[in-house]
Amino acid sequence: MSRVAIVTGGASGIGRATVELLESQGVKVAVFDRNGETPVDVSDAASVADAVDETRGRLGPIDILVNAAGIGTGGPLNGEHYVEVWERTLAVNLTAAMFMVRACLDDLVRAGNGRIVNVASTEALSAGPLTSPYTVSKHGLLGFTRSLAVDLGGQGVTANCVCPGATLTGLTEGIPAADRERFARRHIPVGRYGRPEEVAYMIVALTALEASFVNGAVIAVDGGMTARGR
């Protein structure tokens, strides 16, 4: 029987690449995204609950949850809109993952081999300038992942965290190519930005039934950037 997955943020970037790879392996995938065919606001608990119920009725119980939705934000602490940016960033990047896990939890436990993969960032492992809302949200997602691993591991559910580094997605496409190349030469040992499908490869590997002993792991997919240090 085919497994069923939900991928948040699955309409573009890393999320889209994850959807395509899961589907190529025969997994039935529902995309939760504000820009998807059926828009879902993952930062709203009621919207999440309704969408999960609809998915369950259409595809079956949920076996895999990939929380890939996220927004990149920043600004000075004393900025005029800092509080609003903070609240929105944590709502999308952290609280939404909690809503998703709660809505899917019964299915994941009942499956006996449920898989949760949270997509954070290398910002979860360090901090950059003027990115505190984003950095805090990703540190929080990493901590949430570890808590899930401890709380759910005994019920057959694994939770792991993938931390992409500089990747060619909508969050980085506005950066001039020359600036990207300069950054890559200086900070990334492999000398380039990553591709969404390279991150998706690791995400999907963690959803495999054979990955049942990988739990609470935090995996950087960053071309060696964190190993080198900034």
Residues covered by each model-derived region:
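Conserved mid-core segment of classical short-chain dehydrogenase/reductases
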Residues: G72-E87, R110, L130-P133, E173-G174
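The beta1-alpha1 cofactor-binding region of Rossmann-like NAD(H)/NADP(H)-dependent oxidoreductases
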Residues: V40-D50, V83, E197-E198
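Short, small/polar-rich loop/turn modules that mediate ligand/substrate recognition or access, typified
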Residues: G153, T158, V214-G216
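Alpha-helical segment proximal to the catalytic Tyr-Lys
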Residues: D106, V150-D151, S212
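Residue(s) in the substrate-gating loop at a strand-loop-helix junction
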Residues: S121
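Short C-terminal tail/terminal secondary-structure segment
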Residues: S126, N215-R230
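Active-site helix of classical SDR
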Residues: V101, S137, T145
